[in-house]
């Protein structure tokens, strides 16, 4: 469900027509010869036991422009880790797994705690922060995309559309945020509809003009778990383990990137994920 509305300070890239995914991927494949692109997948092992993760892996088999896929795996014992590794081995591109419940990662967390660096908040924020560090250790990675692993109707076009604005040299964006329609016969997107948007707009009415609140209000789906950014931006951001990753990341991007280098991208006409 697309439109032509450019409604504020954030550039909105709508899905105005069905461009074949093969065309997008061909351009990304050419770009990837000069700019290495990495996909970060934060996942719980339980998501491998749902229809969503096998579908995501099946779709990613057709992606040829990624330098690497990095799985950030949480809540997995040894047997679960081996099963997840078996699933991921089906991909054609190199795969790295950061196993947060594994002995080496646990040893690292204990070492950090001993040195007064609190790691007491396991969750998506901590998982992404640690995994980003391992990706950024490769100094020649140009851009990183991240999306959730509970997308039931995942298509590889979503990844291509998410990465394209930050990867393409003619567009010059540093950060892209995914959005999508949540129009069904049920009230999905409740946290955004009933909490996030009313809260932000109430604060704007109470406080008057505030550029940061205007920035947050300009995203069509601020709580979406899909974004891509260039590695130079990723190196400077702080990721909070205690607050929502999605909103805290927008706060960091607001402070560190020029507004005209931030965009939001229409990823899909419909979007369905695992509901809580």
Please provide the spans of the model-predicted regions.
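N-proximal low-complexity "stem/linker" segments adjacent to membrane-targeting elements
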Residues: 1-62
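Short beta-strand-to-loop acidic/aromatic patch adjacent to the donor-nucleotide binding site
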Residues: 138-152
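Conserved donor-nucleotide/metal-binding helix-loop-beta segment in metal-dependent transferases, i.e.
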Residues: 151-181
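A short, conserved alpha-helix in the catalytic core of glycosyltransferases
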Residues: 233, 242-259
């Amino acid at each position: 469900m697309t439109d032509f509305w450019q409604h504020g300070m954030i550039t909105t890239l709508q899905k105005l027509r069905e461009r074949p995914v093969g065309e997008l991927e061909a351009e990304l494949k050419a770009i990837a010869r000069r700019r290495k692109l990495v996909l970060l997948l934060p996942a719980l092992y339980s998501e491998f036991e749902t229809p969503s993760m096998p579908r995501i892996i099946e779709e990613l088999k057709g992606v040829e422009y990624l330098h690497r896929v990095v799985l950030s795996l949480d809540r997995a014992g040894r047997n679960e880790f081996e099963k997840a590794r078996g699933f991921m081995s089906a991909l054609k591109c190199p795969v790295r797994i950061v196993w947060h419940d594994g002995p080496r990662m646990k040893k690292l967390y204990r070492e950090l705690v001993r040195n007064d660096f609190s790691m007491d908040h396991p969750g998506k924020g901590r998982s992404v922060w640690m995994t980003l560090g391992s990706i950024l250790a490769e100094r020649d990675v140009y851009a990183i995309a991240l999306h959730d692993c509970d997308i039931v109707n995942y298509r590889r076009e979503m990844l291509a559309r998410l990465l394209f604005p930050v990867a393409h040299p003619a567009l010059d964006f540093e950060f892209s945020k995914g959005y999508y329609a949540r129009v069904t016969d049920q009230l999905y997107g409740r946290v955004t509809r009933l909490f996030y948007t009313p809260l932000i707009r109430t604060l704007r009415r109470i406080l008057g003009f505030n550029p940061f609140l205007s920035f947050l209000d300009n995203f069509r789906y601020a709580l979406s778990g899909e974004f891509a950014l260039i590695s130079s931006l990723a190196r400077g951001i702080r990721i909070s383990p205690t607050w929502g990753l999605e909103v805290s990341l927008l706060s960091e991007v607001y402070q560190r990137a020029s507004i005209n280098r931030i965009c939001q991208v229409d990823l899909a006409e419909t979007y369905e994920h695992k509901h809580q």
